[in-house]
Curated annotation (Swiss-Prot):
<comment type="function">
    <text>Peptide chain release factor 2 directs the termination of translation in response to the peptide chain termination codons UGA and UAA.</text>
</comment>
<keyword id="KW-0648">Protein biosynthesis</keyword>
<comment type="similarity">
    <text>Belongs to the prokaryotic/mitochondrial release factor family.</text>
</comment>
<dbReference type="InterPro" id="IPR004374">
    <property type="entry name" value="PrfB"/>
</dbReference>
<feature type="modified residue" description="N5-methylglutamine">
    <location>
        <position position="248"/>
    </location>
</feature>
<dbReference type="GO" id="GO:0016149">
    <property type="term" value="F:translation release factor activity, codon specific"/>
</dbReference>
<dbReference type="GO" id="GO:0005737">
    <property type="term" value="C:cytoplasm"/>
</dbReference>
<keyword id="KW-0488">Methylation</keyword>
<dbReference type="InterPro" id="IPR000352">
    <property type="entry name" value="Pep_chain_release_fac_I"/>
</dbReference>
<dbReference type="InterPro" id="IPR005139">
    <property type="entry name" value="PCRF"/>
</dbReference>
<dbReference type="Pfam" id="PF03462">
    <property type="entry name" value="PCRF"/>
</dbReference>
<protein>
    <recommendedName>
        <fullName>Peptide chain release factor 2</fullName>
    </recommendedName>
</protein>
<keyword id="KW-0963">Cytoplasm</keyword>
<dbReference type="Pfam" id="PF00472">
    <property type="entry name" value="RF-1"/>
</dbReference>
<dbReference type="InterPro" id="IPR045853">
    <property type="entry name" value="Pep_chain_release_fac_I_sf"/>
</dbReference>
Length: 374
């Protein structure tokens, strides 16, 4: 007798059909044809930023449509195989294994459909800043940095630390990471805010319980955005020698770069690259991302003001608590998702929090749209 099927393949086919409707496939295929036509223009690369933007969009659309086509065909093939597997235990086991893998890919595709923001498809800049609390807060900031680097590795993203300011005794004061990959900003944007740690301090001789805070910023990396203009007269560029742990200089040349945007007071630094030119290019990318994030936040605050709902940003936006003592629990204060497996979370297993936030935002967007239609 064949093993029972645990995955409802008929339901998967129905979900994929609904995804196809939501994708507006005829429109997507038309967009692909138009972008392919533009990509064939021999003059395209006269504007490298526009060319990169166009090719990124083309690649994302192709991948999305191809993924749906592949999953839809696989679901229907498995349905046919299941009918043949009623008396074949080996084939039934193979169908079940492939159906389980298919269900996970369908879930991931449904999640990707939630990433509809203007900048969701772009790379991201993630910055971690230690709060007040001295070495405990700096150690906590380093733990968060490691968590996000592990998450990026698990998710298949390329992550590079482009600036790092280490603490005098332990940990870090701040770090900036460039995360590259499809929809990196869309997945990470919900991580912005204050993260709180409660534990018995390893730096306290009395081993007392301490509460530490760290701030996470997430910015879209949109190099070709025309909304952000940086004029030469609006910036001041300083160079200095890159420093290591405790402020020790690790480079005899002034390769590190600090850029100050005079109108806003925003300051960015980069000291990770080998040359001053590379550090300047990276610092300019980060500055542009910060200016774009400032514009996004201003728009959000204006929309919230019109709706009568204040927007809390920065240190006042406490999004998650990580408790190591007197019990172990990670709790997201926005979605109420929690887990006692804090070690797994600190090893980068934060997908449940990311996904719950995206679903919550999508639900709130649907409620807002429904209210505006009344």
């Amino acid at each position: 007798m064949a093993q029972p099927m645990l995955i409802d393949l008929e339901e998967l086919v129905e979900r994929l059909d609904r995804i196809g409707v939501r994708l507006c496939l005829p429109s997507k295929r038309q967009q692909i044809e138009q972008l392919e036509h533009e990509a064939a223009d021999p003059d395209l690369w006269q504007d490298p930023q526009r060319a990169q933007s166009l090719l990124r969009r083309l690649s994302q659309l192709r991948d999305l449509v191809q993924e749906w086509e592949t999953l839809s065909q696989q679901a229907r093939d498995l349905l046919e195989l299941r009918a043949l597997a009623s008396d074949d235990l080996e084939l039934a086991g193979q169908v079940e294994q492939e159906a389980t893998e298919l269900a996970e890919r369908v879930r991931q595709l449904e999640l990707r459909l939630l990433l509809t923001g203007q900048y969701d498809g772009h790379d991201a800049i993630l910055a971690v800043h230690a709060g007040t609390g001295g070495v405990d807060a700096q150690d906590w900031a380093e733990m968060l940095l490691r968590m996000y680097l592990r998450w990026a590795q698990r998710a298949g993203f390329a992550a590079e630390v482009v600036d790092l300011l280490e603490g005098e005794e332990a940990g870090i004061k701040s770090a900036t990471v460039e995360v590259r990959g499809p929809y990196a900003y869309g997945y990470l944007k919900g991580e912005a805010g204050t993260h709180r740690l409660v534990r018995l301090s390893p730096f306290d001789a009395a081993h007392r319980r301490h509460t530490s805070f760290a701030l996470v910023e997430v910015l879209p990396l949109v190099e070709e955005d025309d909304d952000v203009e940086i004029r030469e007269e609006d910036i001041r560029i300083d160079t200095f020698r890159a420093s290591g742990h405790g402020g020790q200089h690790v480079n005899k040349t002034e390769s590190a770069v600090r850029i100050t945007h005079l109108p806003t007071g925003i300051v960015v630094t980069c000291q990770n690259e080998r040359s001053q030119i590379q550090n300047r290019e990276t610092a300019m990318k980060i500055l542009k991302a910060r200016l774009l994030e400032l514009k996004i936040r201003q728009r959000q605050e204006e929309q919230a003001r019109l709706k009568g709902k204040p927007v809390v940003t920065g240190w006042g936006n406490r999004i998650r608590s990580y408790v190591l003592h007197p019990y172990t629990m990670v709790t997201d204060h926005r979605t109420e998702v929690s887990t006692p497996n804090i070690q797994a979370v600190l090893e980068g297993e934060i997908d449940p929090f990311i996904e719950a936030y995206l679903h919550q935002q999508a639900a709130e967007g649907e409620e807002t749209a429904a209210a505006s239609d009344r």
